[in-house]
C-alpha cells in the first residue's frame, strides 16, 4: 500500500499534495509502469482521507497522462520514459544583460479565423437575432472597468516620467516582473524578468520568434490548427509543414520524417480539437528537441480556463528540469483573460536566446504603450488579476454547464458527441447527420447560428478529413445564458 506523509504538505491542499506525491513516485520509478494503483476507497482508508480527495488526485494524474484507467479493472501507471525531476546542476550563462538605462528604445490572436467559407455566410435571419458561436469578444460586465480606470489614473498621476521615457525593446521591467511572478504562482514556472518579452499580440511575437530562430528553419504546425502562424510564415517567406495528430497531439514520427527544425504546439488545450497532450508525448517531444538544434514554441493560450483539476505543467517547466540548454519558447496572451482589444501578449525565452534577442532584435521598439503596461503591472501585482480571472472562470463554467445540460436534454442528444469540454472556451460537437457538411452549414445559417466547422481548420494538405466532417467548433465565450435555450432549439430544428 502507498504511504504518504501529509505532515510535510505545508499550505498545499490534501488533493494537490497527494497528486504531487504520486506524480513524483511515478517519475522516480517507485511506482513502475503498468503497476496497478490502490482503489480509491482502499487508499483513502489507508491514508485517513476522503474518497473524493483520492478521486480528484487520480483524475488529475489521468488528465496529465501519468495514470490510465480501465473499466472494472482500476487505475494503472502509464509507461513513461525515464525523466529526471531534479533541478539542472549547471548554471545558464547568457552574457551581460543591458540595464534598463542602456536599452534603446494584424489583429490579436482570435480563436476563430475569418476564412472565406465563414466570412461569406449571410444569415437568413436578422443580425440582431443571430447567435454567434465564433465571436472572440467579451461582455461588458466581465471587464473590470472601474478598477482598470482607477489604476490608469494612478499611473498617469504617479508615473509621468516613466510614461514619457523611451520603451526598452522587451517591455517595461514592472510588467515583466509581474508576469514572471504570476507564472511562478499559477504555472509553477521559474522565470526571471530578463527572459520575458512583451508585444502587441501573439502574431507580432511569432514574427519576432521566426527572425530570432531563423527563417531558414523548417517549421511544423499542428493539423488541424490555428491558421495565423501559417499566414505569418507565408508572408515572411518562412517554410512550414502541416503535421498530423493523433489523440495525444503531434506525432513524433511526423517530425522526423518531415525534417522539422521547430514545431508550434498548444499542449494544454489544442485548438480546435481540445486535445490535452499527455506527459508521455510531452517527454517524447522534448527528447526530439534535444537531439539537435531544435525548438518548441509552446502556445499556452486559453490555459487559464481549465475547469477540472489543477493547471497542467508546461513544456517550458519540464524542459527546465533537464540539463538541456533550453529548447522551449513559451507564449501566452491576455486576450482571453482580459480583452482582445488590450493587445498585450508575452513570450518567455530560454536563457541562451535572451542575449541573442538583445543583439539581433534589440532595434525593435516595444509595441505596447507604457500606460497600458504600467496599468496591467499594477493590476497583477495588487491581486486584481487573480480575482478577475476567478470571477471570469466561474462565469464561463456556468455558461458551459448550462449549455451542456440543455444539449444533453434536447431531442437531438443521441445524434451528437462532445469532446474537449474541460478546458478552454470551446468544445467540439460532432453531429451524426445523413447530410453533407455544406447542407448542414446552410441549415445553420438559415437558423441564425454562426458557427465554425472543424474542417475549416485543416491546413491545405490535410489528407483524410473524415473525422472532422459535420463537427462544430462551439465557442461559447460570447454566449449569454438566456440565449442557450433558443440556441439548442435552433440546433435541434436545423438537424
Task: Map each language-model feature to its residues.
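N-terminal basic, amphipathic alpha-helical segments
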Residues: 1-153, 352, 362-369, 373, ...
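Conserved core of the PLP fold type I
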Residues: 152-292, 297, 304-305, 312-323, ...
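General small-molecule cofactor/ligand-binding pocket signal
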Residues: 197, 239-243, 329, 419, ...
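Conserved core segment of the aminotransferase class I/II
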Residues: 324, 329-394
Amino acid at each position: 500500500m502507498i504511504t504518504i506523509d501529509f505532515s510535510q504538505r505545508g499550505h498545499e491542499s490534501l488533493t494537490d499534495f497527494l497528486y504531487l506525491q504520486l506524480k513524483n513516485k511515478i517519475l522516480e520509478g517507485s511506482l513502475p509502469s503498468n503497476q496497478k494503483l490502490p482503489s480509491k476507497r482502499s487508499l483513502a482508508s489507508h491514508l485517513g482521507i476522503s474518497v473524493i480527495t483520492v478521486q480528484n488526485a487520480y483524475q488529475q494524474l489521468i488528465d496529465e497522462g501519468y495514470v490510465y484507467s480501465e473499466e472494472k479493472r482500476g487505475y494503472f501507471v502509464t509507461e513513461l520514459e525515464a525523466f529526471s525531476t531534479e533541478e539542472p546542476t549547471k548554471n545558464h550563462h547568457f552574457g551581460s544583460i543591458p540595464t534598463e538605462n542602456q536599452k534603446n528604445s494584424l489583429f490579436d490572436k482570435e480563436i476563430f479565423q475569418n476564412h472565406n467559407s465563414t466570412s461569406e455566410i449571410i444569415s437568413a435571419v436578422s443580425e440582431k437575432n443571430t447567435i454567434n458561436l465564433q465571436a472572440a469578444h467579451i461582455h461588458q460586465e466581465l471587464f473590470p472597468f472601474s478598477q482598470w480606470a482607477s489604476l490608469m489614473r494612478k499611473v498617469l498621476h504617479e508615473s509621468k516620467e516613466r510614461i514619457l521615457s523611451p520603451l526598452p525593446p522587451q517591455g517595461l521591467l514592472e510588467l515583466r516582473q509581474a508576469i514572471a511572478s504570476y507564472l511562478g504562482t499559477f504555472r509553477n514556472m521559474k522565470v526571471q524578468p530578463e527572459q520575458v518579452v512583451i508585444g502587441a499580440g501573439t502574431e507580432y511575437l511569432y514574427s519576432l520568434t521566426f527572425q530570432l530562430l531563423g527563417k531558414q528553419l523548417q517549421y511544423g504546425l499542428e493539423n488541424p490548427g490555428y491558421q495565423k502562424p501559417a499566414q505569418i510564415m507565408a508572408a515572411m517567406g518562412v517554410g512550414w509543414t502541416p503535421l498530423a495528430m493523433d489523440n495525444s497531439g503531434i506525432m513524433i514520427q511526423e517530425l522526423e520524417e518531415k525534417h522539422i527544425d521547430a514545431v508550434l504546439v498548444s499542449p494544454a488545450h489544442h485548438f480546435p480539437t481540445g486535445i490535452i497532450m499527455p506527459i508521455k508525448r510531452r517527454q517524447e517531444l522534448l527528447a526530439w528537441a534535444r537531439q539537435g538544434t531544435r525548438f518548441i514554441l509552446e502556445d499556452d493560450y486559453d490555459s487559464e480556463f481549465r475547469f477540472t483539476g489543477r493547471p497542467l505543467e508546461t513544456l517550458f517547466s519540464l524542459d527546465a528540469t533537464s540539463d538541456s540548454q533550453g529548447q522551449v519558447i513559451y507564449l501566452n496572451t491576455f486576450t482571453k483573460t482580459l480583452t482582445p482589444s488590450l493587445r498585450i501578449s508575452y513570450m518567455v525565452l530560454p536563457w541562451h536566446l535572451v542575449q541573442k534577442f538583445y543583439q539581433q532584435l534589440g532595434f525593435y521598439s516595444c509595441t505596447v504603450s507604457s500606460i497600458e503596461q504600467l496599468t496591467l503591472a499594477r493590476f497583477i501585482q495588487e491581486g486584481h488579476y487573480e480575482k478577475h480571472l476567478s470571477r471570469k472562470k466561474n462565469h464561463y463554467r456556468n455558461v458551459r454547464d448550462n449549455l451542456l445540460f440543455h444539449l444533453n436534454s434536447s431531442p437531438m442528444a443521441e445524434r451528437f458527441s462532445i469532446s474537449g469540454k474541460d478546458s478552454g472556451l470551446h468544445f467540439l460537437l460532432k453531429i451524426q447527420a445523413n447530410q453533407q457538411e455544406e447542407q448542414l452549414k446552410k441549415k445553420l445559417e438559415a437558423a441564425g447560428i454562426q458557427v465554425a466547422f472543424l474542417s475549416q481548420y485543416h491546413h491545405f494538405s490535410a489528407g483524410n478529413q473524415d473525422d472532422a466532417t459535420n463537427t462544430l467548433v462551439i465557442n461559447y465565450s460570447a454566449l449569454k445564458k438566456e440565449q442557450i435555450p433558443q440556441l439548442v432549439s435552433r440546433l435541434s430544428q436545423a438537424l
